[in-house]
A protein has these predicted regions:
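Short aromatic-glycine-enriched beta-strand elements
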Residues: 2-6
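Short, structured beta-strand/loop micro-motifs enriched in basic residues and often containing a Trp
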Residues: 7-17
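Short, well-ordered loop/turn sites that connect or cap secondary structure elements
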Residues: 24-25
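Terminal, basic amphipathic appendages of nucleotide-handling enzymes
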Residues: 38-69
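A generic structural motif
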Residues: 12-13, 36-39
């Protein structure tokens, strides 16, 4: 099992999974993450959850930090 969070970049967009590292991240928070398109700002729609490694595209990109208002 691997820990993941689900992040959206648009209101009704696809959910992307990221590695939360050791951060305490919950649903509703905003995060800065590393994506294939560079560093982006997203909204957490799925808090830290354990998932089977086969269901997640590896390697997961990390959360850089929790976004501040």
């Amino acid at each position: 099992m691997i820990k993941v969070i689900g992040v959206r970049f648009r209101r009704a967009g696809k959910v992307y999974y990221f590695n939360p590292l050791d951060m305490d991240i919950t649903t509703g928070m905003h995060v800065i993450v590393e994506t294939a398109r560079g560093v982006e700002y997203g909204y957490v729609v799925l808090g830290v959850k354990d998932m089977d490694e086969e269901k997640v595209f590896q390697p997961l990109k990390p959360v850089i930090r929790i976004a501040t208002p």
